[in-house]
Amino acid sequence: MEKSWFNFLFSKGELEYRCELSKSMDSFAPIEKTPISQDRAIYDTDKNLYDWGERSSYYNNVDLLVSSKDIRNFISDDTFFVRDSNKNSYSIYFDIQNQKFEIGNGLSDLEVFFYSYRSSSYLNNRSKSDNDPHYDPSIKDTKYDCNNHINSCIDSYFRSHICIDSHFLSDSKNYNESYIYNLICSKSEKIRESQNCKIRTNMNRSDLIQDFDITQNYNQLWIQCDNCYALIYKKALKLKLNVCEQCGYYLKISSSDRIELSIDPGTWNPMDEDMVSTDPIQFHSREEPYQNRIDSAQKKTGLTDAVQTGTGQLNGIPVALGVMDFQFMGGSMGSVVGEKITRLIEYATTEFLPLILVCSSGGARMQEGSLSLMQMAKISSVLCDYQSSKKLFYISILTSPTTGGVTASFGMLGDIIIAEPYAYIAFAGKRVIEQTLKKAVPEGSQAAESLLRKGLLDAIVPRNLLKGVLTELFQLHAFFPLNKNEIK
């Protein structure tokens, strides 16, 4: 159980909030974007408190003025400590998911305050016409009413910062809809360390287990951002091209959606759709046979393997397009993937078509052994003929993640290499490098922005601009839209 401290100052018959909720026992930095001015701070080393100096703002009831990015601090089953201006300490136990809120250690003093506040002449002389939003005549001197009042104040705060109805988040009949599940839509303090890096770096995975369990029941309606963990309505996400509107993170996009985004409607002609993988080396696996994994991936994605290839028109320009799908066994490159890409390049060479390959892969497929590794050389060989002999134009688009054998072969052979923002691009993963070299890999060194600065990429292009950029590049290289008379 995590324990955190925050302070209240009881004075002048009113309640003044003096200290924002600290992130943990080891972190006492103030929370940003609070409506209270921050004049001076006092650090109490005896009790590990981060105390605040004089404030000019007073509040008539217990409103927790923490910023929305620290809602995560109110985790289920959490104990906080409160102390008043007389240094009297109280423990407050929160279990928002199970609707528990308890006050201990000197409760009577806290109750006296609420009773005296309710009975003060300031409140008794107040007329209803004052329309004070903080006035609540329901406050009484009992533990039950005190708890309910603070509960309602906390709940009102959550509702003002989270725009998701709680009945979407729980199917329990006993779940109180007045409580918002506190882990949804919160933001990490390190989402945006710089303008060029929005990748979450400081999040305990165990804190998010319940989030994932909840969203699994509603995955046909909602999807959760991998970066800020906000819940996003699937239909709205598709309109945003799978870009999280909360943090700008680029979520993975299926190969079918990518084709729909890039190719003009009604012009897509798929190739080699009936080509499927077998188990050429009889790969042995204790967990799941290779053929079973292929079958389950086919049922999950509706694809025969991890790449779709074909021809179509991009703003009227005929192109050959191959799109890898990470949802199919991590986009791994086996014999079928290599063969389909090879045939696509050969067809583009014969028909003098510009070529686009969209990469999203974890590398060579280990279940096929050396057969998967030889695909690197096979694809590179036909690309050499396409680029060097025929002088045709190949654009490589790297999405997150692009690693392993794909990076080491056709991923980095494009005449123009384009990456999506914040894409993870590497040959070997961070963990492999650190275990092999016994050296730490600098944070962000394998991100697209870092590779662009090092000269390994030509451009980083957002999804909404990609089709227009490709059109201009093709026209620059003398590939123009078909005339209306030429379109069949």
Swiss-Prot record:
What does it catalyze? Answer: N(6)-carboxybiotinyl-L-lysyl-[protein] + acetyl-CoA = N(6)-biotinyl-L-lysyl-[protein] + malonyl-CoA
Quote the cofactor binding remark: Binds 1 zinc ion per subunit.
User: EC number(s) of the enzyme?
Assistant: 2.1.3.15
The processes (GO biological process) annotated in the record are: fatty acid biosynthetic process; malonyl-CoA biosynthetic process
Top EC class, one word: transferase
Q: Where in the cell is it found?
A: Plastid, Chloroplast stroma
Pfam families recorded:
Carboxyl_trans
What would be one Gene Ontology cellular-component term for the protein?
acetyl-CoA carboxylase complex
Which residues of the sequence carry a binding annotation for Zn(2+)? C225, C228, C244, C247
The name on file for this protein is Acetyl-coenzyme A carboxylase carboxyl transferase subunit beta, chloroplastic
Q: Which organism is it from?
A: Aethionema grandiflorum (Persian stone-cress)
* Name of the gene encoding the protein in the UniProt record: accD
